[in-house]
Amino acid sequence: MRGSLALMVPSIAGARMTQNATFESVTTDSRTASAGELFVALRGENFDGHDFLEQVASRGVGAVVVEQLPPGLKLPAIVVPNTLVALGQIANFWRTRFDIPVIGVTGSNGKTTVKEMIASILAAAYGEEGRLATRGNLNNEIGVPLTLMRLTEAHKAAVVELGMNHPGEIGRLTAIAAPAIGLVNNAQREHQEFMHTVEAVAQENGAVIAGLPADGVAVFPADDTYTDLWMGLAQQRGQRKVITFGLTSAANVSCAHRASGAGSELDVTVAGTGKGDGTFTVQLAAFGLHNVRNALAAIACAVAAGVERDAIVRGLESFAPVSGRLQRKQAACGATVIDDTYNANPDSVRAAIDVLAEAAEPRILVLGDMGEVGTQGREFHEEIAAYAASRGITTVLATGELARHMTAAGAQHFEQFDELLAALDAKLGTKSDATVLVKGSRFMKMERVVQHLLGQHNSGKEAH
């Protein structure tokens, strides 16, 4: 993002400029701030960017955005009531300079995977340099603005992931990103500590639909409990275009599917969308029914953006699973490791267990606590243990405070992480053809189990 303070100030509520200046890009990180950049001094729980203004000045930044102007600071500045809000308004100012399809991706599970599928499709259509995509999962009130500020004249389309864990966040991010296409991938049991009900999650994620312009396109499942809710949001301000997806013939984008090699083969049907209608086949290198649905969501968004069919097929067929999301790896002992350690909630764990259940025996589930479950922690962990047993997963190794509730259904619980690793090693031996699914919420750092199995013995022997 390149610009001047004078051009931006009218777009920032309550802003006051000390003097004009131009800048080449925007940063919020004092450690990497460099000459010619605009530094936005954010405040966080454990830091305050205002404490580093002298440091960024010594690095040669061109200007700063601050809430308080310290005495003696000679840098050009914009003074605002709230720098986090200002960051979003600056990003929206920049975003509105580009008349390109921006796709906003929300949902309880699969956001990052669908975003990467869409990014792969857009790269096939416009080239790697012709599309912008969220890096990793930078999907919050800092990550979304920083993503949008990377827009350039070279970009023909963009896909931006919008995340939340509290009410109101999707609406704010939608206002910043101003998407022309809004996807709700699903509504499931995420962030229940703060959201309390799945309906509240559905309503919150639906804010991306409510925030679309009148000519925007709403994309959501045709076969979800909350389909009618999202349809209602799409029609609140006139008849926005709607493209649905799902495993039902009633969906605009649907498919027949079968297991094939390292993933699934999809016979896709697109109907009732206009220009993108037709049938085609996609070889998807990702396991699980939920990834079939993720692919349908990506196709629906691509159709909404006007992407040609050949680019949709090429993009999806070049997609590779995202790190820590059902990635298949080979353990040192020969076992197959399914690395799904990025995060966990009850519905994503059930989906991962479904993938494990398709593998030949022996099968092992290694699970750490699921977080942000509110008062339902015991219930959710008992449910998952029972579900694993119902799918024929008889070896379940669990760790974490809440995971102790899984023992009633036959799981083994370990207080110490090194005890879990020792038990897993004993079950696998030096040579094994087992399949091991490893999953847990981010704070459990279950990737340490994967590192151990792969022979990367830096996993640490921590207690929980």
List each language-model region with its residue ranges.
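Residue-level signal for inorganic ion chemistry
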Residues: M8, E37, V56, I90, ...
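Phosphate-binding loop of NTP-binding sites
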Residues: L87-A222, D228-Q239, Q451-H464
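Active-site beta-alpha connecting loops in nucleotide-dependent enzymes
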Residues: G44-F47, V322-G324, T341-H413, S441, ...
